[in-house]
Amino acid sequence: ILGPVLGLVGNALGGLIKNE
């Protein structure tokens, strides 16, 4: 359960950081 959730969260954070 935590695997996919962490993946989605990491992806979202990565996108925000890349946008900055």
UniProtKB/Swiss-Prot annotation:
Expressing tissues: Expressed by the skin glands.
Family: Belongs to the bombinin family.
Domain of life, source organism: Eukaryota
Location relative to the cell: Secreted
Keyword Iron: no
Pfam families according to UniProt: Bombinin
A GO BP annotation: defense response to bacterium
Role summary: Has antimicrobial activity.
Lineage: Eukaryota, Metazoa, Chordata, Craniata, Vertebrata
Keyword Secreted: yes
Organism of provenance: Bombina maxima
GO cellular component, one term: extracellular region
Name of the featured protein: Maximin-Ht
Alphabetically ordered keywords of this record: Amphibian defense peptide, Antibiotic, Antimicrobial, Secreted
